[in-house]
Amino acid sequence: MSGKTLTRMDLSEAVFREVGLSRNESSELVERVLQLMSDALVDGEQVKVSSFGTFSVRSKTARVGRNPKTGEEVPISPRRVLTFRPSHLMKDRVAAGNRS
């Protein structure tokens, strides 16, 4: 594992190089796409990216947890959590280490 993280700037730079938009337009495009995805998730919608995966929000109910150190019961409040489920193609690509 290389330890490198893909950032917004990296995505903008890739759009700049591959699509030919200006750097500002590339950055705005990436920001807009991420904003649309975020807004959809906040509204409880799923975000499906073909050949990549599905982002969704799950509602978890309140439950009783336990402090592993003391064994004391602790209430866990209800909350919404973000989940990602990779597509089969993405799983296969990652397993094979295929970059194309």
From Swiss-Prot:
Pfam families: Bac_DNA_binding. GO terms for biological process: DNA recombination; positive regulation of metabolic process; regulation of DNA-templated transcription; regulation of translation. SMART domains: BHL (SM00411). Keywords: DNA recombination, DNA-binding, Transcription, Transcription regulation, Translation regulation. One of its GO terms (molecular function) is structural constituent of chromatin. InterPro entries: Hist_DNA-bd, Histone-like_DNA-bd_CS, IHF-like_DNA-bd_dom_sf, IHF_alpha. GO terms for cellular component: cytosol. PROSITE patterns: HISTONE_LIKE. The keyword Transcription applies. PANTHER family: DNA-BINDING PROTEIN HU, INTEGRATION HOST FACTOR SUBUNIT ALPHA. Belongs to the bacterial histone-like protein family. This protein is one of the two subunits of integration host factor, a specific DNA-binding protein that functions in genetic recombination as well as in transcriptional and translational control. This is Integration host factor subunit alpha.
